[in-house]
Amino acid sequence: MTRIRFTAAYDGRPYLGWQSQPGGRTVQDVLERAFSGLFGTTCRIHGSGRTDAGVHALGQVFHADAPDTHRIPADKWPAALNTRLPRTIRITHAEYVPPGFHARFSATGKTYRYCISRAPILNPFDAGLAWHRPLAWSVDILEQAVHLFRGTHDFTAFAALRGNEPRPIPEGYFRRTITQTQVAQTGEHVFITFTGTGFLYKMVRLMTGAAHEAARGKITLEELARLINAPLPDDKSPFCAPPDGLTLMRVHYPEETFGDKKKIN
Amino acid sequence: MTRIRFTAAYDGRPYLGWQSQPGGRTVQDVLERAFSGLFGTTCRIHGSGRTDAGVHALGQVFHADAPDTHRIPADKWPAALNTRLPRTIRITHAEYVPPGFHARFSATGKTYRYCISRAPILNPFDAGLAWHRPLAWSVDILEQAVHLFRGTHDFTAFAALRGNEPRPIPEGYFRRTITQTQVAQTGEHVFITFTGTGFLYKMVRLMTGAAHEAARGKITLEELARLINAPLPDDKSPFCAPPDGLTLMRVHYPEETFGDKKKIN
């Protein structure tokens, strides 16, 4: 067996999220069926993490182990798989990696982008791809709010619980570091970009929702700063933005080991 | 009854085209159900023309007659209807017009845009929105080819037959005038824009297909020019581009009567 690291882009609208489910209508299920068809045997793939139903990706990463009978040049893998995939899922890159590589455990960070549309009437081509916020709000305050998330914080107020957390929840369980934030405006769209070492369940959507509540004047920047820097046990983000606008842009790995262009094997 | 002119945008992917069909899965059917629900009585709408299955619109125009019980300000019509429509169809503009206005017969021209993607791997968000032509071809020759269509020509070679044409086909039946053409490139996308006084069935897709055959060297510009300017009875465009990349951008009406901003009534 040889381990391969794949990069995938997908339109999340037709799928029930990344993670395999009994009904088989998830991105992982569709990818595993393509691999299994190609290999003639059941194949499991391992993603860098889940994306929720309706969330998109331009740079999701996963790994799979290919039988030695399928040792083709790395740059032939995308086409070999894309012919077996619906057009809403594309493999954009593949490279052979050492057996110690793991898409989830080797990752050092992720970049997400959230798209908000300010159009008076949502463009039908943005349906499911942008959060429609046509009423008055301030992009300037949104930007100030988003930058408050930078740094290492206890993100308790910006984490939804999956229900499988250890009890009592250990000290530092919700601590994460946001290394970069950016707000950019292009026509009717406002794009928020978050890069961090790790993200909690629904964290980007809860940060975006809270920042937008500040931008439309429902909470102050001071109140938001307290949620971020000194949360009380019951503090919660005032709003969770919908999945529509969210795209996983990139998963980061240590450059020295897995450069985008460098062939390991 | 009061006549209203509506402008609509739609993502054509989920629909079997504009024109009403028994199954009810067309844009016209969905719109008529929204009007009928609002009026409490069956309502027919009249489009500027058909768009085929999978073809999109940013500026389709149609008219409808509203009962006098529904005389609301023109700028309230889009929201009143959009709440009853799927997000892939949006009413973007409405205005009251004189009873003599007809979306089809009053139109003086249309503008269509065709989108080609040159990306090595088609972006999953472009699936159904662009024609994927990743192999080598010349945007420069495409542009020269597209401009050959300007002017008044017998477009016999660029018309698909619907089967309901008069026989024998009258002299001049396929004569049309293309008033403007444009080719623009943005990143991986090449956009071709055609404005004309009228378009035959599949004409934009047949022009685009032929221009692309020239751009990839399958026919010469001289051969294309002959198809346009001196077609023989059996001449046909060498290729019909798929519906995916096609968008009806605008329907033109005499400015003096129906300006976009001018309220008639």
Swiss-Prot record, chains A, B:
Q: Which domain of life is it from?
A: Bacteria
Q: What class of enzyme is it?
A: isomerase
Q: Give any GO molecular function from the UniProt entry.
A: RNA binding
Query: Any idea which residues are catalytic in this one?
Result: 52
- Which positions are annotated as binding substrate? 112
Q: Does the keyword Protein transport apply?
A: no
Q: Does the keyword tRNA processing apply?
A: yes
| Protein keywords | Isomerase, tRNA processing
Q: What is its EC number?
A: 5.4.99.12
- What InterPro entries does the record tag this protein with? PsdUridine_synth_cat_dom_sf, PsdUridine_synth_TruA, PsdUridine_synth_TruA_a/b_dom, PsdUridine_synth_TruA_C, TruA/RsuA/RluB/E/F_N
**Gene3D superfamilies documented for this protein:** Pseudouridine synthase I, catalytic domain, C-terminal subdomain, Pseudouridine synthase I, catalytic domain, N-terminal subdomain
Q: By its UniProt entry, which CDD domains does this protein fall under?
A: PseudoU_synth_EcTruA
**Record GO biological process:** tRNA pseudouridine synthesis
Which reaction does this enzyme catalyse, per its entry?
Answer: uridine(38/39/40) in tRNA = pseudouridine(38/39/40) in tRNA
Which NCBIfam families is this protein grouped with?
Answer: hisT_truA
* Family that this chain belongs to: Belongs to the tRNA pseudouridine synthase TruA family.
What is the protein's known function? Formation of pseudouridine at positions 38, 39 and 40 in the anticodon stem and loop of transfer RNAs.
The subunit field of the Swiss-Prot or TrEMBL record says:
Homodimer.
Q: What is this protein's record name?
A: tRNA pseudouridine synthase A
Organism of provenance: Akkermansia muciniphila (strain ATCC BAA-835 / DSM 22959 / JCM 33894 / BCRC 81048 / CCUG 64013 / CIP 107961 / Muc)
